[in-house]
């Protein structure tokens, strides 16, 4: 009976563990992209050169812990845009999108990741459910992404509908699974 119990519940445990760990945007072209439909990044996607230009964004990491806590590490700088009241480029994070502690809920069956906490996000801070915000004051306290984990558990693809289209963010583990 113990063996059967383990076999029934082992897959459930592995689903929740899929997202645990530390992730960074994949240092490649199209790690960030936007387009008219899910998975379509025809409106814009980052180039390989943007990985260097936006190095302050690509070095940010997000750690998901087993207890539902997450930490967004921005290392003192991230990519800023005009909607934040700053010139486009690398600079000190602007509140409330300053990283730090938040919580998350991952549902492997539904393929969703919800991050909770004012300003908590993955990808770009301006992208929330149903909109791109135009001021830091409009930050959301909860954002839900459609997520898929692939490449042996080492790639996380997050999609979010912002109204007129979809953003896509591709992350990779900082320490790959064996």
Please identify what each model-predicted range represents:
Residues 28-34, 50-152:
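Contiguous, well-ordered beta-strand patches that form the walls/edges
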Residues 82-85, 165-176:
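C-terminal/domain-terminus segments
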Residues 156-165:
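Short, exposed beta-strand-loop hairpins at the edges of beta-sheets
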Residues 14-24, 175-178:
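N-terminal helix-cap/turn-to-beta initiation motif at the start of protein domains
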Residues 1-20:
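Bacterial Sec-dependent N-terminal signal peptides
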Residues 20-26, 30, 155:
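Buried hydrophobic residues that stabilize the cores of well-folded domains
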Residues 33-48:
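Short, polar loop/linker segments at the starts of domains and inter-domain junctions
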């Amino acid at each position: 009976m113990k063996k059967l119990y383990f076999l029934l519940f082992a897959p459930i445990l592995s689903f929740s563990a899929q997202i645990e760990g530390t992730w960074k945007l994949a240092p490649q072209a199209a790690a960030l992209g936007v387009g008219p439909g899910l998975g379509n990044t025809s409106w814009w996607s980052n180039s390989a050169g943007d990985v260097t230009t936006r190095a302050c964004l690509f070095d940010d990491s997000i750690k998901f812990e087993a207890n539902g806590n997450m930490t967004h590490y921005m290392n003192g700088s991230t990519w800023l845009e005009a909607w934040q009241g700053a010139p486009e480029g690398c600079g000190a994070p602007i509140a409330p999108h300053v990283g730090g502690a938040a919580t998350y809920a991952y549902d492997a069956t539904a393929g969703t990741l919800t991050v909770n906490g004012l300003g908590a996000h993955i990808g770009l801070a301006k992208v929330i459910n149903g909109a791109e915000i135009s001021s830091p004051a409009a930050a959301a306290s909860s954002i839900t992404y459609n997520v898929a984990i692939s490449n042996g558990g080492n790639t996380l693809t997050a999609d979010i509908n912002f109204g007129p289209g979809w953003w896509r963010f591709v992350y990779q583990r900082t320490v790959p699974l064996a």
